[in-house]
Regions:
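Surface-exposed, low-hydrophobicity beta-strand/loop segments enriched in small/polar/acidic residues
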Residues: 1-33, 398-428
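Extracellular, repeat-based ectodomains that mediate carbohydrate processing or recognition
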Residues: 27-399
Length: 428
């Protein structure tokens, strides 16, 4: 016997021919929000604007931000989320020796991150590949201009297509009618190269947009406000092929001016969740379920998750362990940080009553750390000199597992058996 067996208990046969008692393991947790952990607090400084990602190879979070105490230069802090909900940060690392207004950091597979940003010296957009080691990161050389034409970008967001092993950037081209443009990047070692650009919106886009990878359908989904259609909330589905991306038709999910987009993939239900600010409904914080089929997307009915005027930012990610997602945002009045927990059922959404996260901020970003099954939320703490801080959120769950399958049950133990001893079984 492999392990002790109690008389009368069901028994399985292992692949090596030994037998073991059927066991049941219950793994559970209750909802918990941690205190704040500082990643940038030098005297007279702090963090402006933040972007966070999770490196699933090294089990680290990486936070990109503007360091107020160093002329707003682009900086990255790497941290470890611990099982007790605390976060341990290493020494921040300079990523770009200038102060870009627009930037985004994304996990790029194989223990790498990519940080994309506005090139303030040469124009256009640039990026670097970061390699994480411990609670630190080192960067390769700056890439060539990903716009291909030196045009000014006004915002850049990124997603990683794990099927194609490519990074997709989406940006606004300020020199070409504020059109929405996408480009595919290929990481090789510590460098990244880009293919040709593709427009996903040719009549201008609004001030925010977001994109995420649907791993069930191997598609990139971009949410944006369509300037050619009254800035309605819209999505397009993109397919990456080597160094290019193509898009299906535009699909409207909100027939009103929509802003502050955030999007994630719900791997429990194989759905996209899009959060946004609905200006047609008193600027309420709203979300909708999207179902991808081929290069098209259809929607359920939008659900309000906060009946108050929200600031120009939301962030969202999904907890694959608890099967739920969390949205974070700040209120327009007072910049109070809030969060809500969402559940998908078919194409419908339901939310818990929104709760205070703690502190105030103009901008927050959230990511799920699958190593410890907790969310990490980074923000500029308006309550404390814009210090860069992060908190963790642990969702409640109750998961039961056992070692019994439809094929390995062999019978019941006749007598109590010690570990390593022979067992006699009743098989009928």
């Amino acid at each position: 016997a492999s392990g002790a067996i109690t008389a009368g208990k069901p028994v399985i046969v292992n692949s090596n021919g030994t037998v073991a008692q059927v066991f049941e393991n219950v793994d559970s947790a209750t909802l918990a929000v941690s205190g704040s952990y500082t990643f940038e607090s030098a005297a007279g400084s702090g963090a402006l604007y933040v972007s966070i990602c999770f490196d699933s190879v090294n089990n680290k979070i990486a936070i990109a931000y503007q360091d107020i105490g160093n002329s707003n230069k682009l900086t990255v802090a790497v941290g470890t989320v611990n099982t007790n909900g605390s976060i341990t940060f290493g020494t921040p690392v300079l990523a770009y020796n200038a102060s870009p207004t627009y930037f985004h950091i994304v996990y790029a597979g194989s223990g790498k991150v990519v940080i994309a940003y506005q090139d303030t010296s040469a124009g256009g957009g640039a990026s670097k590949v970061g390699t994480i080691s411990g609670n630190s990161v080192s960067f390769g050389s700056q890439s060539s201009d990903f716009t291909g034409n030196g045009n000014t970008i006004q915002g850049v967001y990124a997603a990683y297509d794990s099927n194609a092993d490519r990074v997709v950037l989406a940006y606004k081209d300020a020199n070409d009618g504020d059109d929405g443009v996408a480009v595919v990047g290929t990481v090789s070692g510590t460098s990244i190269s880009y293919g040709s650009t593709t427009k996903f919106a040719s009549s201008g886009i609004g001030t925010t947009w977001d994109l995420h990878f649907d791993s069930s359908n191997n598609k990139i989904v971009i949410a944006y406000s369509d300037g050619g259609n009254n800035y309605y909330g819209t999505c397009k589905v993109g397919t990456v092929s080597d160094t290019s991306i193509s898009f299906g038709s535009a699909a409207v999910f909100e027939s009103a001016d929509s802003r502050a987009f955030a999007i994630c993939f719900d791997s429990t239900n194989n759905k996209m969740i899009i959060a946004y600010k609905d200006t047609g409904n008193s600027n309420y914080a709203t979300a909708v379920v999207g179902t991808v089929s081929g290069t098209s997307i259809s929607y359920g009915t939008p659900a309000v998750f906060n009946s108050a005027n929200t600031y120009e930012d939301h962030s969202i990610d999904h907890d694959s362990n608890a099967g739920k997602h969390v949205i974070v945002w700040s209120l327009q009045s007072g910049l109070t940080n809030k969060y809500a927990i969402g559940t998908v059922s078919g194409t419908s959404l339901s939310y818990t009553t929104s709760a205070n996260l703690g502190d105030t901020a103009e901008q927050l970003d959230i990511v799920f750390d699958s190593n410890v099954n907790k969310f990490a939320v980074a923000y500029d703490n308006e309550s404390s000199s814009n210090n860069g801080v992060a908190r963790t959120i642990q969702l409640a769950y109750n998961n039961t597992t056992n070692n019994l399958t439809s094929e390995n049950f062999i019978g019941f133990a006749k007598d109590a058996v010690a570990d390593g001893a022979s067992a006699t079984l009743h098989t009928a």
